Amino acid sequence: MTNDERSTNAQMTQHPERARRHSDFAIPSVVVIRHSSFSLGLIATSAQLGKLLEKIARVDRVAVDTEADSLHCYREKLCLLQISLPVREVVAGIGDAGPEWRGPNAGREHRSRPQRDYVVDPLANVDLEPLCAALERKEIVLHGADFDLRLLRRGLNFSARRIFDTVIAARLLGIREFSLAALVKRYFGVELGKGSQKANWGRRPLSARMIEYAINDTHYLLPLADCLESQLRERDQLDWLRQSCQRAIEQAAVERVRDEDELWRIRGSASLRGQEVAVLRALWQWRENEAEAADRPPFHILQNHELLNAATSFVSGSMPDYKHFSSRRRQAFRQAARTAMRLPESEWPVMRRRFGTRPGRETLRRAEELRRRRDWAAKELDLEPSFIAPRSTIEAIATNETCATTLLVPWQQAALDL
């Protein structure tokens, strides 16, 4: 699932919207969820996992998606792993609900590709290393691979070898509306339900509605990949897909390193001056410590705008207070500010002013030429120009053409005549 389709901490209020409650069920040793549209197995024991591994061994392609919790804990964690498999034969076992289920949309093309859906609980006391080993040998179908690959790498130390990203495939076909919901509607005429996006996926038991919502994210991926692959084959662009998917794997394997001296520089901090900046830095670090100790997102402790207001208030002589603070937290909050205010001016952080360096005339000329080539290729190929090369990439190559091989895959380089 793409990052844009997921909720983020930055936009949340102090009291995030709670998921609508439905009839909850416990996670027993065996469970089969039967809805009008789904029959799936929930994997929460080693025995269930063993049966799933047997099924994975018989297929070449596996659809995978994840659900994470970053709204209710300090560090984002993997909470659910959804898996869909093509069914080659009727096999009794986990999630078996009789004859092979062929999907809710009888008469549609994906009826010819029966499948089974499973939900693996990473929070259960089950060793998932055998699952990772099994998946590494398969082609993994994902929708917006970057988020899921990074989460699986952090949570399970899993690294995919081959992927089929349905977002990349759709964009190669010139499809502008490439959200999962849009693609499922386009190819299968099915409206995916909404909801549970802000739910607490780390809470147990999960509701039946939450699990149905989660499995929606893989249920259509295999037939969708079949449709997209067929169209790309007709256009002789399957190699383009392989190149871009391999690059996605490589990029997801690179750990994003953030400058520790940048983390506390939140939006609005540039308006602070002198001692206010020192207090903000101290309060930000205090909030991080409190959030980690409580295993809650930082915005549950204090929101960014409240940090900014508190920094200016302390320096002006006021004593900001918040009703939801315990006496211990209130004392630590004020102590952090007092300690920062005792720092000598030489230890105050300096707010950085960013001034762009205007590129030279030759660099501008090269950038304009690259844009012209890109836009012409985009029109000829019926692709979005930014999918061939975004503006930042154009500017980087105009400055240093040798970085083209790092920033672009071969088909993109060819489109720019590099």
Protein language model regions, located:
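Short hydrophobic/aromatic-rich motifs at helix boundaries and adjacent loops
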Residues: 53, 100, 120-124, 152-156, ...
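Generic structural signal for short, solvent-exposed loop/turn connectors between secondary structure elements
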Residues: 10, 15-19, 34-42, 88-91, ...
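Short aromatic/hydrophobic-glycine micro-motifs
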Residues: 61, 99, 188-190, 237, ...
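Short N-terminal alpha-helical targeting/association segments
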Residues: 6, 14-16, 57, 157, ...
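Intrinsic disorder/low-complexity segments
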Residues: 2-39, 87-115
